[in-house]
């Protein structure tokens, strides 16, 4: 009887933790869509939801720093994108600093951008409930080792950093990527974290991206994996525990031109059933050679 009581007590303690760990999940994946007549060709690298169907989007190769405003309407039942319209470009400064991330603070009605040049920063996200900005580099910092490639057998170890509303460092956490799945680097190979997305409960979505360009072009592919981590359950000096929510592999070959290099990601509006929309946007390198496309994709997630 004593053993049974102990087991029941352990289960009672663990069950809320298990439920909490499983509270975020992807419940619907919509097909990627393109709106080339409504959107200018771009190197879209970050997106932030402004409310009222409006999204701020940065282009890391735009002539000047700033962001586009796209109005994107969503089917409130399925989460599928219905329409896209371009409301113009908001210039913030002269010249280009390779903007990679963008976030929006609704309480201050302020848009924040971050550039990769000289820093390697790849992402930026902000959450109103936690009052935290999150960012990371695309590849490991020098002190954390060499970047992983298909040839060297290494694993990327990243540092996810969070800042409060005053831009004071509030935490730093180690994150370990999966090992590369490509057998060789091909003509070009990019492997790293392309975006983060902060959620209301303090957890963070991490988008891992592996992009292999074949030597002839045909056979190029891009694999994206969406993980969730919760810094609250991991000591600062330990590697974050992660759970896979979704993965996708797009290709460029004779039969398929679905190749999508997703670099931007943000939480959008709630749907009619209370679930949340997650919007992803791809970097097409200005629709490179007519085969790359400015893909948009939506996932529907539960967050409570």
Residues covered by each model-derived region:
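Bacterial Sec-dependent N-terminal signal peptides
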Residues: 1-23
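Sequence/structural signature of beta-propeller domains
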Residues: 22-304
